[in-house]
Amino acid sequence: MKNQIKEIREAQLMSKAELARKAGVSPVTVDRLENGAECRMSTKRKIILALGLKLTDRNEVFPEDEW
């Protein structure tokens, strides 16, 4: 199942660059994640928090099978 990073980011009218800045990752990383690339657990946490979500909301962003 595909992650929901792009959908959540766009719903918040946030650019890839802004999400990357807030998460402390590169825009290339955000692009890769939005296209389904795997990443470290620490990167997932950064993305979730940068989207303004709680870590308990992780399944809204990343499907359970990715944890």
Where on the chain are the PLM-derived regions?
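Alpha-helical residues within the helix-turn-helix
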Residues: 10, 21, 49
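A short, Lys/Arg-rich alpha-helix, primarily the initiator
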Residues: 1-11
